[in-house]
Curated annotation (Swiss-Prot):
Protein name listed in UniProt: Aspartate--tRNA ligase
Species this chain originates from: Escherichia coli O127:H6 (strain E2348/69 / EPEC)
UniProt binding sites for L-aspartate: 171, 217, 448, 489
UniProt entry tagged with the keyword Cytoplasm: yes
GO cellular component: cytoplasm
Described function: Catalyzes the attachment of L-aspartate to tRNA(Asp) in a two-step reaction: L-aspartate is first activated by ATP to form Asp-AMP and then transferred to the acceptor end of tRNA(Asp).
Subunit structure: Homodimer.
Region ranges (Aspartate): 195-198
Residues making up the signal peptide according to the UniProt record: none
Family annotation (PROSITE patterns): AA_TRNA_LIGASE_II (PS50862)
GO function terms (MF aspect): aspartate-tRNA ligase activity; ATP binding; nucleic acid binding
Amino acid sequence: MRTEYCGQLRLSHVGQQVTLCGWVNRRRDLGSLLFIDMRDREGIVQVFFDPDRADALKLASELRNEFCIQVTGTVRARDEKNINRDMATGEIEVLASSLTIINRADVLPLDSNHVNTEEARLKYRYLDLRRPEMAQRLKTRAKITSLVRRFMDDHGFLDIETPMLTKATPEGARDYLVPSRVHKGKFYALPQSPQLFKQLLMMSGFDRYYQIVKCFRDEDLRADRQPEFTQIDVETSFMTAPQVREVMEALVRHLWLEVKGVDLGDFPVMTFAEAERRYGSDKPDLRNPMELTDVADLLKSVEFAVFAGPANDPKGRVAALRVPGGASLTRKQIDEYGNFVKIYGAKGLAYIKVNERAKGLEGINSPVAKFLNAEIIEAILERTGAQDGDMIFFGADNKKIVADAMGALRLKVGKDLGLTDESKWAPLWVIDFPMFEDDGEGGLTAMHHPFTSPKDMTAAELKAAPENAVANAYDMVINGYEVGGGSVRIHNGDMQQTVFGILGINEEEQREKFGFLLDALKYGTPPHAGLAFGLDRLTMLLTGTDNIRDVIAFPKTTAAACLMTEAPSFANPTALAELSIQVVKKAENN
C-alpha cells in the first residue's frame, strides 16, 4: 500500500512519485489550496492539494484530524522561503495526485493542541501512542533491545527463556498467584525475577545467559514502578564481580553511545558506606555537587541536646549540608525545607546562614548559634568549606534518619536552586552493601536477596556475626537512579542453609520452598554471578522522560489498573468454580 514512510522523505526523493499511508496530523484549508501534515511512525510530511487535481482536492476538503488515509503524489522541493527548518522533511513537500480515505475518525477524546490528563491518555492509549514523542520513545526502546541482543550475542551470551508459571519464593514482594485447574487448591506464581532459574542454568553448564524478560511484583506502586516490568537479566559462571561489572558497564556505555552519542567514560566505584556518608543515599546523584559532612565530634560537649544526644550516641549522627549561595533562602523557604525533612522522620532542621564569615558570630544568622561558641562555629565553617553567602543545614538523629532526610534534602535543594547539572550524565557503581538489615521485629532480612554471597566470610563466621557481613553485591546508578543490580551468588549448600537460618527459615521450610535449589547445590555447582537491568528505567533515562509509563506501550496506573481494558475485572463464576475458588466478601464495619 505504501512505497515510502512520510518521515523519511528527503531532497533525494524530489521528482519521484510516492505512495504514503498514515494519519492526518493537521489540516489547513486556503480555499484553492489545501495542505495537510501527514504522519506515520517515522514522522510528518506536508502534502498539498491544488485545483489541477480537482477530485483529490474535493475529497481532501472532507479530511479531519486522525483520518487514516493513503496519498499518491510527487515529491517537490519547497521554495527557499517556505522551508521549515524545524521538520526533518521541511525541505520538501508532496503534491497529491490521488487520495483515499481508508477510515474516518470520530471527534477525538484527546486534544493534540493541549495537555491531556494522564488518565485520559491511558484510557485512550492507542491514540496517545500516535503522538510523535510517544512513538519516538517506543522506537528508542526497540532500538535498545536490539542493541542489547547484538551486544550479548557478540559476547557469547545465550538467550534462554525461563518459566512464567513457577513456584512462589520469598523475594521481597508479594507474588501474583495463578490457580491451577488440574491441581485443585494449588497455585503457580508469576516470577518476580528469573533468579533461581538462571542460577540453575549456571549449574547446568550454560555459563553465559541473558534474557529480556517480563517480571511481576504485587506491591504498592511508586511513580517509577509497575506491577509488570521488563528486565535485561544476566548470569555468568567463572567470572568475578569486577569482571561482571566490566562487561555490564561496557554494555551500558555502548547503549549511551549508540542512542545518545555520549561516551560515559569509566564508571567510578563507591562503597555503600561511602555513598551513605557523603550523599545520604545508596544511589547518589553525582550531578549534584553538595555532600554531607560529619560534625558530631565537634558537638559532643555542647549544651544542646538536639546535637549532643546523637553526637554521643554510637547509633547517632550529626551531619551538615553546605548549600552554596543558600543564604539567600527566605524564612518561608527554610520552614518548607524543615517540613520536608519531617517526611523522613527528622524532627526539624537547624541551620546557619553565613553572611560574612570574617565577622565570626556577628557574621552569621542561626537559631542555634546561642548554643554554640565562636570556636565551634568556626570549626564547622572550616570543615564544611563554607563561604560568604552559603547556608549550612544540619541533620541530627539516628544514622538512618539523618541519611534519609539529609539525602532527600540534598536532592531537593539541588534541584530547587539549580545546583544539579541536568546536562550531565553521572554513572557509578555502588558496592559492598550490608548483607542483612533489621526487619523491625528483632530479626534480620536480606538487603538484596537470600542467594547473595557474603564477601570474605566462611559459613561459620557468618553465623557467628551476621550483622558484620558485607554482601558481594553491586548496583549500577545513573543520575540518582538504580538502573541495575546484581551480586555474586552462593554456590555452596552449607553457606546457603546458613543464610536461610539467619533469615529465620527453618530446615523444614527450606526443604519445602528451596529443596530443588539445595539439591542442585550438591552436584558440582560453579561459582556464578549476575545482574539485572530495569529496561523500563534505562529507556526512561535514554529518552529523557521522568515518567516510566511514557516508555511502556500499555502501562498500568499506580493502582495497578489498566484504564483502557478495565483490567483487573471480575471473573466468571463458572471459571472460579472450575478452579475451586470462592470470593469471600469482607463484612462491612457498622
